[in-house]
Curated annotation (Swiss-Prot):
Quaternary structure (record): Part of the 30S ribosomal subunit. Contacts proteins S9 and S11.
Molecular function terms, GO-annotated: rRNA binding; structural constituent of ribosome; tRNA binding
GO biological process: translation
GO CC term, one of those recorded: small ribosomal subunit
UniProt-listed Pfam families: Ribosomal_S7
PANTHER family to which the protein is assigned, alphabetical: RIBOSOMAL PROTEIN S7
Ribosomal protein in keyword set: yes
Entry keyword Ribonucleoprotein: yes
Name recorded for this polypeptide: Small ribosomal subunit protein uS7
Keywords assigned by UniProt, alphabetized: Ribonucleoprotein, Ribosomal protein, RNA-binding, rRNA-binding, tRNA-binding
Function, as annotated: One of the primary rRNA binding proteins, it binds directly to 16S rRNA where it nucleates assembly of the head domain of the 30S subunit. Is located at the subunit interface close to the decoding center, probably blocks exit of the E-site tRNA.
Taxonomic lineage of the native organism: Bacteria, Pseudomonadati, Pseudomonadota, Alphaproteobacteria, Hyphomicrobiales
Amino acid sequence: MSRRHRAEKREINPDPKFGDLVVTKFMNAIMLHGKKSVAESIVYGAFDAVQSKLKQEPVAVFHSALDNIAPHVEVRSRRVGGATYQVPVDVRPERRQALAIRWLIAAARKRNETTMVDRLCGELMDAANNRGSAVKKREDTHKMADANRAFSHYRW
């Protein structure tokens, strides 16, 4: 990792259908091998499925799912005097969003439905209702931070 300067944040445009920057970030994270149109069809297909099943605004469901997945604290390793401690630290808002998106996609890819649209739709609905493996990942992260609260004075 270069220590010269911090990489500049790239400007991204909101998605054409909903005009939401977070949806664009989500599409970019789903995209494989530069196939943006495939990622768009997956995300929009999942949003349409969510709207038909829940009769709610899909972007609102998406944002509530991300809020339910995003961790508030996580543990980071800190080496002190030959011992490595798992120190709980607060998560920055940008990282919270990035982790939530990453965990949502990973959980959707692990599901057993046939198409990615169905998997993503199911995981979005589960996460919006505080269920699913992405929410479980957040709970596990919070439990780990709570268990290591004794080492919180090692923060940096």
